[in-house]
């Protein structure tokens, strides 16, 4: 829950006018009340898009406070986050709920960004590989190949988000490669190689270039740094400089 309306639109305006990405797509995920306003700000900006931070697992009905996929597509949203670490932690969203949210996304033409990642305890115990592998198997293995092909994945090392700890580029690459290898247990390798996997562990202007330079890191899910115009512009420029 960051920004008020004026801050959100000012951020979007400054970022979309401050860089012209040619090799990347920049997706803004503003809070629900500001989706339309931010969409209008970036309407004429090339390679900028917009998505929602969450959606309901239900198609519709008496679920006060929920926002359905159909509502989002009715205001021309393109993307939606599913399974963000904060939704998992604070709202107890488990595998079944996340699968239902993915289905709602697909049925209504939204492109989901499915988030996965391990907390500090799993990393410290050496169980991070099994933990993240199970997150993938328990949800994404239930998708059809066509659905998976429409999904973006974001790896969030929860232990490196807002803790002062930072995942090394090598650690990021290890986990991104793991995610691809797990997906290949079920899906065609050629298709899996084409799926974008974003890194979401405290990406900033200082580490973006080294992280984005890893073979299996296809971009970033940027948190706090996206609230600072110059930092976010530097991150976009780092992505643009790769390849």
Residue ranges and their predicted role:
Residues 1-67, 149, 154:
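Conserved N-terminal beta1-alpha1 strand-loop-helix module at the mouth
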Residues 73-77, 85-243:
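Expand to "…catalyze enediolate/carbanion chemistry for C-C bond making/breaking, isomerization
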Residues 27-29, 51, 81, 113-115, ...:
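Structural detector of well-ordered beta-strand residues that form the stable sheet scaffold
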Residues 43-103:
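Glycine/small-residue-rich loop that forms an oxyanion/phosphate-binding "nest" at active or ligand-binding sites
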Residues 9, 68-69, 238-241:
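A glycine- and small-aliphatic-rich helix-loop capping segment at beta-alpha/alpha-beta transitions
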């Amino acid at each position: 829950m960051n920004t008020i309306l004026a801050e959100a639109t000012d951020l979007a305006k400054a970022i979309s006018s401050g860089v012209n990405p040619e090799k990347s797509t920049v997706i803004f995920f503003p809070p629900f009340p500001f989706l339309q306003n931010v969409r209008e700000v970036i309407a004429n900006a090339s390679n900028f898009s917009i998505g929602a931070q969450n959606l309901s697992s239900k198609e519709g009905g008496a679920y006060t406070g929920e926002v359905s996929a159909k509502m989002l597509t009715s205001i021309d949203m393109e993307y939606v986050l599913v399974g963000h670490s904060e939704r998992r932690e604070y709202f107890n969203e488990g595998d079944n709920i996340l699968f239902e949210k993915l289905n709602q996304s697909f049925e209504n033409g939204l492109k989901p960004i499915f988030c996965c990642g391990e907390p500090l305890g799993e990393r410290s115990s050496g169980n991070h590989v099994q933990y993240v592998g199970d997150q993938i198997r328990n949800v994404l293995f239930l998708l059809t190949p066509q659905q998976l092909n429409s999904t973006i994945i974001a790896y969030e090392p929860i232990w490196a988000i807002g803790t002062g700890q930072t995942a090394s580029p090598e650690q990021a690459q290890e986990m991104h490669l793991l995610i691809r290898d797990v997906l290949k247990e079920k899906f065609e390798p050629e298709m899996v190689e084409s799926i974008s996997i974003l890194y979401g562990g405290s990406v900033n202007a200082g580490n973006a270039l080294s992280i984005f330079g890893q073979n299996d890191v296809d971009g970033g899910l940027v948190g706090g740094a996206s609230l600072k115009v110059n930092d976010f512009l530097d991150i976009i420029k780092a992505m643009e400089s790769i390849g």
